[in-house]
Amino acid sequence: MTRFNAIIAALLLAGGASLQAHGQAGASRRSASDTVPVGMQLKLGDVVVYGSHRDFGLRSSQMSAVSVTPAMIERTPVFFGEPDVLKSLQRTPGVQPATEGTAGIYVRGGDYDQNYITLDGSPIYNVEHMKGFVSAFNPDMVQGISLYRGGFPARYGSRLSSVVDVGIEPGDFASYHGKLSLGVLSSRLQVAGPIWKSHTSFNLGARVSYFDLIAKPILDKVYDNSDGLKGYENMGYWDVTAKLVHRFNPSHRLSAMVYYGYDRDHDEPSNSDRVTDLRDNPYVHDYEKIRFEDHRAYSTKSSWHNLLASLYWTAWFSPRVRLNTNLSYSAYKYDLKFDYTVASHNEDKEKMLYDYNENVVQQFKTLISEVALTSDVLWSPLSNHMLRAGVSLSRQRLKPEAGVSRVYDKVKLVEVDESGGLRYASDADTLYFHVSEKQYLNTWSAYVEDDFTPFGALRLNAGFRAIVYSVRGHTSFSPEPRLSARLMMGSNLALKASYARMSQGIHRLVSGNLVMASDRWVAMTSDIPMMKSDQCALGLDASLPWHLSLSVEGYYKWLKNLIDYRDGVSYNMTQVDWRDLVAVGKGHSYGLELMLERKAGNLTGWLSYTWSKSLRQFNGHGNVVNGGREFYAPTDHRHNFNITVTQHFSLSHHWNLDLTAAWSYLTGRRGTIANTMVTPPALYEYYAGEADGTTSGQYISFPQWVNRTFFVLHMGDTPEQFYTTHNRNTYVLPAIHHLDLTASFSHSWKYGESALALSIYNVYDRLNVSNVYVGFKDTHAVLKGMCPFPFMPSLSFTHKF
């Protein structure tokens, strides 16, 4: 085997690369992943090889997918100049951020939990640091990213909307090297090299943040009201990623990977003290000459942990047959604690009148863990066939917990007798409530797929996946056909189409309240079935002059068995079974996507645009939300436009300059805000008798002409005034847009390569509203917007050694 053929074999079998070799006289031959005989001969002069983590280009049967390289991640301007894996995906078609500046992704109208995100083939449940500002992946450890938003191959399943496959770079088997990065928000260190040359390698990366040391003092000077930063000043994270690879022989390889990430978010206690002393005031009545003391304190503490460990064995039984087996463990834990204290004391000059002390603590915990075993075989019996087949087993454990403790004591003067004797009444109590539930979801699946070429112009990927979900007392089966097709309409134009059915056994409950959002993970039950989706897509891929590629796609997606909170449900109703708080419904989304990209040359970049709609409806018997009327999903954004352009300059043999400009526009996100006040007895007259005795958390249905279901916040002998909404997700925040610039100077020298990058986020200082809260203006309650990302310059330094 020649050296060139050995390189081809290694790349093709290692991870699905695509190679195009150009030789003399302009002749070329393209080879797709796992389809090329190792013994092929190419007579070449000077060779230039272009490779990527996955090839989803013109000649691939795959559509609705994109591959992102580490270089693209580094060139994407982001807040505080922090390279981010998921934020680079947000600039591709069909992908939207949760809010401005955050790393979470929503794909083709789907929800956050509908993304199957893997690290080296193993699932990870929480992919964010710092309340979503930073993704959980260390960019220095990433080999490549593949995002599927439709046309899913049969080897993927268990989520409805997307698959994000993040590959970790293996260590170098021959030499040591590393990378040190210093930024405004965090620092990173990555080291790789051989443990046993040519046999065992390692790759180790670590990150730590220091928001309060550099970023916060800068923001204090920028913000018009620095009090808005109090929720971030005790926020931080760190993570470690490690990969070990051992080659037993040329045919067998074992990889071990470990990831651990930790976040903390401890708000500074908010205190309020008020003292009023009227005992010596000559202008008040004698019974008003009292000294009042009132103290209130409130604090929030939260932390979350991610742990992922996997063993991955690869065996080549022949150049055409490969077996992959992966054993993994993934766990996510979230802790949230509210602490509220009240102390009141009243006295006059002679005696104590009233003393009250109360402490309330609320705690919420979520634990998700999964053990999974997957195995699949790849077989290329012919040059125009690539067969895959595999099985997977997994067991998920979901354990949500909620607890409330309340301790109070009260002493009150009730009587003063004629002789001046005092009689006090006292009351004290301790209340503790805790609810916990364990759910276990077992999943079995098997698949088969074939990527083949019936004839020259037509290429197909046909597959079938069978999946079984099982919880206590209930089992569901989902047959899932998959088909993707590519038809060449000339040498530079291809028509593509796809269909995929997907299913999902876990749900994420989300409050759509823009003022106070919340979430909770739960498994399907006998009453709440697994979610399903069917998606069709049609598109054109074109190869254009000047190294340009163009992709245009339209899609339609049907969603079934979605769940959502019923109207008016509060996220902290800990004493109510979550099954009684939710409704089951359906949804659909559709849109048009465009992407223009240039990867070669000194001028590179991409342009993407998405027009889309996403709607939900809950109108089944006993599952009515929003009066049964269709409403927009929280993930509905009509327009999403991104353009990123990078110009490379070779200033000298050792100096290089890269200038990057990126502009983004996104329609504002939707949410629900209580904007309708109901005052008794107007709407209650009809149900006055039935309303009597209603307790907090119950629902009251009003006459048909009202066509609403209202939620009662407080009830005494008669209903009190309260707020509600007319429709779900009718409030739309203003559109978000910003221009970001980055200039990176790099210098090569005998000790490695150093780079200094200056980034400016939001150049024209657009006030982009990410959230709203209730404030006051002239004693009137009004909605105020939070704009956390103003004009923000940052500096970072990187050294490769």
Stretch-by-stretch model annotation:
Residues 29-36, 46-50, 60-113, 121-140, ...:
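Periplasmic N-terminal accessory/gating domains of Gram-negative outer-membrane beta-barrel systems
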Residues 132-135, 143-153, 162-193, 201-208, ...:
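Short strand-turn segments of transmembrane beta-barrel domains in outer membranes
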Residues 183-208, 223-270, 301-323, 387:
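Transmembrane beta-barrel wall of Gram-negative outer-membrane proteins
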Residues 245-263, 299-472, 488:
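Face-selective signature of the C-terminal outer-membrane beta-barrel domain
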Residues 366, 370-372, 435, 525, ...:
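Outer membrane beta-barrel strand-and-loop segments of large Gram-negative receptors
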Residues 491-536, 556-579, 620, 662-674, ...:
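Surface-exposed extracellular loop regions of Gram-negative outer-membrane beta-barrel proteins
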Residues 556-558, 580-673, 798:
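Gram-negative outer-membrane beta-barrel transporters
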Residues 664-719, 734-740, 745-801:
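C-terminal beta-signal and adjacent terminal beta-strands/loops
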